[in-house]
């Protein structure tokens, strides 16, 4: 049975990859399972300059998920390409670099730098992180800013360009179409929902940054609907993400319209979940006598023309 999928110019051996920010740079997981078995390796967000991130506490468990306010803590581009990239370039054949900037110029700088490295096969633009006061949420919810970022990076970057969208908007299909028209090769849907938790004893917000991004199974129904809606709105591949913790959860995303999927919070719960999921998806195709995982994409839309 065929698990291969195509994202932009890339052919992935299977549709399963980690969500940026939940898998580090892969180094913490390489002794748990062979990362070459993944469809791709998506690393945590890199910015031009080092970021210390938000003040702690940064992570808190909630019902059916978690809320985090990491604040894009990372060592910056120079350290990444000099110290980290040499360590991870052979972990998987398809390395996807997630980048964020505090200005259009910073996105352009990172795209120009990434273009120089053959090891980096694709970029995923983080225009949707809800934890940072500059960039992130502002870009992801400002339609004109989104268009400007994607189009400016597209002019510089010739390899596969993926845009990760925020769900914290009124109609995500408008942003999906804007990203496609600006030059995106694929979309990642979705990032986290903005949320807050309060300690009733201290009567203060628990997170150091007060608010953060909610992820995990609690957001899956909303994520599936957004993939479903965007599948009808755009013609480029969608990478579905949001609360995938089982084979059935993954299948929901494919049926809604996803070509590939990312696993986030579940990596903390079960570090070996992704290789198990890949195996179970293959078994599912065999049991259902489906020749290719690509055949599942968008099947939930069948018959809509008659509704």
Curated annotation (Swiss-Prot):
The keyword Cytoplasm applies. InterPro entries: Aldolase_TIM, DHO_dehydrogenase, DHOD_1B, Dihydroorotate_DH_1, Dihydroorotate_DH_1_2, Dihydroorotate_DH_cat, Dihydroorotate_DH_CS, Dihydroorotate_DH_I. Binds 1 FMN per subunit. It is found in: Cytoplasm. Substrate binds at residues 44, 68-72, 126, 191-192. FMN binds at residues 20, 44-45, 98, 126, 164, 190, 216, 242-243, 264-265. One of its GO terms (biological process) is 'de novo' pyrimidine nucleobase biosynthetic process. The active site is at 129 (nucleophile). Its cofactor is FMN. Pfam families: DHO_dh. It comes from the Bacteria. Pathway: Pyrimidine metabolism; UMP biosynthesis via de novo pathway; orotate from (S)-dihydroorotate (NAD(+) route): step 1/1. It catalyses: (S)-dihydroorotate + NAD(+) = orotate + NADH + H(+). It is an enzyme of class 1 (oxidoreductase). GO terms for cellular component: cytoplasm. Its EC number is 1.3.1.14. The keyword S-adenosyl-L-methionine does not apply. GO terms for molecular function: dihydroorotate dehydrogenase (NAD+) activity. PROSITE patterns: DHODEHASE_1, DHODEHASE_2. Keywords: Cytoplasm, Flavoprotein, FMN, NAD, Oxidoreductase, Pyrimidine biosynthesis. Heterotetramer of 2 PyrK and 2 PyrD type B subunits. Catalyzes the conversion of dihydroorotate to orotate with NAD(+) as electron acceptor. NCBIfam families: PRK07259.1, pyrD_sub1_fam. This is Dihydroorotate dehydrogenase B (NAD(+)), catalytic subunit. It comes from Carboxydothermus hydrogenoformans (strain ATCC BAA-161 / DSM 6008 / Z-2901).
């Amino acid at each position: 049975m065929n698990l291969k999928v195509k994202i932009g110019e890339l052919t992935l051996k299977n549709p399963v990859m980690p969500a940026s920010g939940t898998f580090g740079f892969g180094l913490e997981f390489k002794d748990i399972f062979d990362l070459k078995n993944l469809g791709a390796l998506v690393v945590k967000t890199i910015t031009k300059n080092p970021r210390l991130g938000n003040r702690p506490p940064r992570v808190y468990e909630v019902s059916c998920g978690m809320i985090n306010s990491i604040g894009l803590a990372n060592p910056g581009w120079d350290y990444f390409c000099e110290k980290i990239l040499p360590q991870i370039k052979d972990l998987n054949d398809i390395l996807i670099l997630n980048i964020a900037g505090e200005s259009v110029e910073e996105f352009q700088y990172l795209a120009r730098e990434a273009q120089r490295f053959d090891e980096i096969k694709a970029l995923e633009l983080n225009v949707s992180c809800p934890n940072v006061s500059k960039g992130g949420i502002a870009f992801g919810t400002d339609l004109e800013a989104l268009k400007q970022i994607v189009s400016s990076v597209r002019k510089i970057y010739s390899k596969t360009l993926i845009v990760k969208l925020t769900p914290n908007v009124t109609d995500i299909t408008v942003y999906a179409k804007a990203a496609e028209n600006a030059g995106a090769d694929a979309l990642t849907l979705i990032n986290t929902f903005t949320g807050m938790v309060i300690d009733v004893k201290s009567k203060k917000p628990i997170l150091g940054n007060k608010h953060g991004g909610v992820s995990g199974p609690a957001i899956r129904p909303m994520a599936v609907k957004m993939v479903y809606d965007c599948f009808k709105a755009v013609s480029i591949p969608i990478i579905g993400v949001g609360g995938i913790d089982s084979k059935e959860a993954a299948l929901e995303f494919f049926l809604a319209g996803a070509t590939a999927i990312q696993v986030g919070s579940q990596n903390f719960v079960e570090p070996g979940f992704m290789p198990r999921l890949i195996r179970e998806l293959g078994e599912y195709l065999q049991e259902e006598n489906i020749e290719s995982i690509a055949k599942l994409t968008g099947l939930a839309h069948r018959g809509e023309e008659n509704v």
